[in-house]
Structure formats: structure tokens, C-alpha cells
């Protein structure tokens, strides 16, 4: 799993409490955290010969701006692609989802930014 930084990826999540209730924006601090952790994963792969798979990542869509979510998805998936680290976005049609079950459509602001 990777949810760097949780103050951004979990903002507005009802199960966390008030700690992440403030609106946060995707910025260089978050970019740097993602890059640092993915570089660490790549170094681990190279050192051990074991592949890393980020089995869960995403942004809770409670109060985050769609533009910030798009930028996060774009950046995170691009870093993974550049470093050849496999990933799986969390999840299909709930709080982090790529699909709007009520509308019966994919969320362009998420799905269009995968690399």
C-alpha cells in the first residue's frame, strides 16, 4: 500500500476522524514523498531481485478537488511506470473509485490519468 501523504489521500475520510478533515492540495511535498518512497522500492528491487507491487493506492474523493486527484493519479502512475513498479489503484466504485455506480460511468478525472 502507498498513501503518501495521508493528509492528502485520506482528506474527508469518515473512518479517520477529524485529523484529515481539512482540505489539502497536491503539491511538491507530496510529489517528493511519492518519488522518495518509489525510489526506495526500486532500490529494494535492484538489491534483492524481488519485484515490488503497490497493491493499493489512491485518493479518497470526499473533499479533494478533482484537479488535485487527477494530478496525483497522473504523477503517481507516471513515477511507477518510469521505475517499472507494478501497481493496482484502490478501488472500483466507492470512496476512492474509478467508476460512478449511480451514473454508470467511469470517472474521467481518475481513469484518464493512468499511464
Spans of model-derived segments:
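Extracellular glycoside hydrolase catalytic/binding regions
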Residues: 1-83
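Aromatic-rich peripheral "rim/lid" segments of glycoside hydrolase catalytic domains that contact
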Residues: 63-115
Amino acid at each position: 500500500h502507498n498513501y503518501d501523504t495521508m493528509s492528502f489521500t485520506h482528506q474527508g475520510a469518515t473512518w479517520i476522524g477529524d485529523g484529515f478533515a481539512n482540505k489539502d492540495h497536491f503539491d511538491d511535498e507530496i510529489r517528493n514523498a511519492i518519488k522518495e518512497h518509489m525510489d526506495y522500492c526500486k532500490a529494494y528491487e535492484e538489491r534483492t531481485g524481488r519485484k515490488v507491487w503497490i497493491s493499493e493506492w489512491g485518493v479518497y474523493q470526499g473533499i479533494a478537488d478533482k484537479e488535485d486527484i487527477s494530478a496525483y493519479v497522473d504523477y503517481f502512475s507516471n513515477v511507477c511506470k518510469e521505475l517499472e513498479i507494478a501497481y493496482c489503484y484502490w478501488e472500483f466504485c466507492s470512496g476512492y473509485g474509478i467508476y460512478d455506480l449511480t451514473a454508470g460511468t467511469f470517472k474521467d478525472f481518475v481513469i484518464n490519468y493512468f499511464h
